[in-house]
UniProtKB/Swiss-Prot annotation:
Function per UniProt: Specifically methylates the N4 position of cytidine in position 1402 (C1402) of 16S rRNA.
Coiled-coil region(s): none
Subcellular location(s) of the protein: Cytoplasm
Gene3D superfamilies in the record: Putative methyltransferase TM0872, insert domain, Vaccinia Virus protein VP39
Species annotation: Prochlorococcus marinus (strain MIT 9215)
Catalysed reaction equations from the record: cytidine(1402) in 16S rRNA + S-adenosyl-L-methionine = N(4)-methylcytidine(1402) in 16S rRNA + S-adenosyl-L-homocysteine + H(+)
Protein name as it appears in the record: Ribosomal RNA small subunit methyltransferase H
Pfam family of the protein (one): Methyltransf_5
BP GO terms, sorted: rRNA base methylation
MF annotations from Gene Ontology: rRNA (cytosine-N4-)-methyltransferase activity
GO cellular component: a single term: cytoplasm
InterPro entries: RsmH, SAM-dep_MeTrfase_MraW_recog, SAM-dependent_MTases_sf
């Protein structure tokens, strides 16, 4: 069963660290210039772009997103600014701007609607197909991925992207299940099988035992690390002199890449030796913000 593209009512993503993103752009010396242009590399529901377009009346933004559901929702949210927002169907790693811009913002990782819509297959809280594709046009979903990989490669993937110490045991169980029973019925069955690899006392902790494995599969399906590396290499070329790049990451693999890029890229001046984290008030209001880390750099 597919999600109806005409219905974006389920898309209720809360953008993270919006105040901090706004403040980061004040580092740009011409932020109040009448010809201000920027790129929202992960448009999502349009929350960050909405706040920026509302604050800067002369600002024009190009909004990128590979998820068609996000683009539909964002276009509705940003309708009052339709003359100043240009929404593109693109992964940020594949985009090449025609002209340089004043800033680029990126809010990485899975968004709330992708998690909350069971038909997208990102979560085991509600049963859904083993999908996990941010772009529904990708050929390989999570189901095809676990079928295609051998046990060793699956274990390595779960360990590399999920930092899961029981990766070998989990991979062995997944491949055994597939051999004996065929495909999993959905996300809940896979999560239940993974949980069975843990000692009983570890199965009912605050963090579900399948969480790290699901993260690893999602990262692999969407090639999140590869596309981030490509983006980080390209993005300084998108900026005008003094331009700002602000990136929010949500897990250690992403944050290490962003930190290293901002520190070692000779084209950039790193403006955040330590990442900016969400306020206590925001985390209380939006629990999913708690792992967010914002890093900022400026083109020299």
């Amino acid at each position: 069963m597919q999600t109806d593209l005409s219905d974006s009512s389920f898309f209720n993503h809360k953008s993270v660290m919006t105040d901090e993103i706004m403040a980061s752009l004040e580092h740009y010396p011409l932020i109040h210039n009448n010809q201000l242009k920027g790129i929202d590399a992960t448009l999502g529901g349009g929350g960050h772009s909405f706040n920026l377009l509302r604050k800067y009346s002369e600002l024009n933004i190009i909004g990128l997103d590979q998820d068609p559901f996000a683009r539909i929702s964002a276009s509705k949210k940003l309708d009052e600014f339709k003359n100043r927002i240009d929404i593109r169907a693109s992964n940020f790693a594949d985009f090449v701007p025609k002209e340089k811009v004043s800033f680029v913002i990126a809010d990485l990782g899975v968004n709330s609607n992708q998690i909350d819509d069971p038909k997208r297959g990102f979560s085991f809280q509600k049963d859904g197909p083993l999908d996990m594709r941010m772009n529904p046009l990708l050929e390989v979903d999570a189901e095809k991925l676990i079928e295609a990989l051998n046990e060793k490669d699956l274990a390595n993937l779960i360990y590399k992207y999920g930092d899961e110490r029981l990766s070998r045991k989990i991979a062995r169980k997944i491949k055994l299940d597939l051999k004996e029973n065929g495909k999993y019925s959905g996300t809940k069955e896979l999560a239940y099988s993974i949980a069975g690899c843990f000692p009983p006392k570890q199965r009912y902790k605050k963090i579900h035992p399948a969480t790290r494995t699901f993260q690893a599969l999602r990262i692999a399906v969407n090639k999140e690390i590869e596309v981030l590396e490509k983006f980080l290499q390209a993005v300084p070329e998108w900026l005008l002199p003094g331009g700002i790049i602000s990136i929010i990451s949500f897990h250690s693999l992403e944050d290490r890449l962003v930190k290293s890029s901002f520190k070692n890229d000779q084209r950039l001046k790193n403006l955040t030796k330590k990442p900016i984290t969400p306020s206590e008030q925001e985390v209380e209001f939006n629990k999913r913000a708690r792992s967010g880390k914002l890093r900022i750099a400026q083109l020299k």
